[in-house]
Amino acid sequence: MAKISVIGAGNVGATTVQRLAELELGEIVMTDIVEGLPQGKALDLIQAGAIKGYDTSIIGTNDYAEIVDSDLVIITAGIARKPGMTREDLIKTNSKIIAEVSRNIAKYAPDSIVINVTNPLDIITYIAMKSTGFETKKVFGMSGVLDSGRFASFIAEELKCSKKDVQAMVIGGHGDLMVPLPQYTTVSGVPLTDLLPGDRIARLVERTVNGGAEIVELLKQGSAFYAPSAAIVSMAEAVIKNSKRILPASAYLEGHYGQEGIYFGVPVKLGASGVEEILELKLDESQYETLRKSSETIRNTISQLEI
């Protein structure tokens, strides 16, 4: 049976554990630095199993040693965005947290695959890779699945159709410079560009780019966690089941899309060994330009880090 460890027992981490438990993908360890928090949430989720009908083993702990021999580790630790705070504002605090988390992953689960969820996503994923010392394909970030889901949701709302029929694609940095791709977005196989005029698509793209901030402003405290946890679990399932799904993820680029040595949201094939392949899509010039701006922002931030 697979072993999955979730670092961080906040809203995103605990909701991820709930979804993993309900799917019975493997035994789960949830760890957090706050005493009692992971233990209490684990106990609650264990008792929920009697009602929902799952027998998943769930351990809540403050001890990193419990993640030993994990097949998959999901990082959700760190502080969340507050109203008016950009993802880049998070870098100083979260980079230190994730460096420490990553060193413990390397110590106790050296053969694991790592999915990072902590923001600023692309930069923190780079820190996780460097701090673990793992192969780049074994460390990747959850970004595009969430952003694509938001894009798909807005499209379904606009067209008054089922979300099940929308296949959306968003690449680029996880932040203000993400790149939704209408030409690779379909509704039951029909290109979005055949269904909506450019101005309406542009409004949906703008709302997608601001999707996380919109929720932060409404909540006043904290940020989204239902959709992020759903996105995390879709990626985790692809790894645990070795299903070779094509999903957008923040992956390490080595010449792909003209970029070198950074993490960036791109379509990838996910399986038991992590990122098994990066798919290159043809983009128009404006999309390439946005990617270049996004990558430059990430690169400049990384150059200022002390790793």
Swiss-Prot record:
Q: What does the UniProt record say this protein does?
A: Catalyzes the reversible oxidation of malate to oxaloacetate.
Query: Which family does the entry's similarity section mention?
Result: Belongs to the LDH/MDH superfamily.
Please, which domain of life does this record's source organism belong to? Archaea
Q: Which InterPro entries match?
A: L-lactate/malate_DH (IPR001557), Lactate/malate_DH_C (IPR022383), Lactate/malate_DH_N (IPR001236), Lactate_DH/Glyco_Ohase_4_C (IPR015955), Malate_DH_type3 (IPR011275), NAD(P)-bd_dom_sf (IPR036291)
Q: Which UniProt keywords apply?
A: NAD, Oxidoreductase, Tricarboxylic acid cycle
The name this protein carries in UniProt is Malate dehydrogenase
Reply yes or no: does the keyword Nucleotide-binding apply. no
Residues annotated for NAD(+) binding in this entry: G8, A9, G10, N11, V12, G13, D32, N94, V117, T118, N119
- Please name the catalytic residues of this protein: H174
Which residue ranges run through the membrane? none
As one GO molecular function, the record gives:
L-lactate dehydrogenase activity
Q: Which GO terms describe its biological process?
A: lactate metabolic process; tricarboxylic acid cycle
Q: Cite the binding residues for substrate.
A: R81, R87, N119, R150
EC number in record: 1.1.1.37
> Which species does this protein come from?
Methanosarcina barkeri (strain Fusaro / DSM 804)
Substrates-to-products reaction catalysed:
(S)-malate + NAD(+) = oxaloacetate + NADH + H(+)
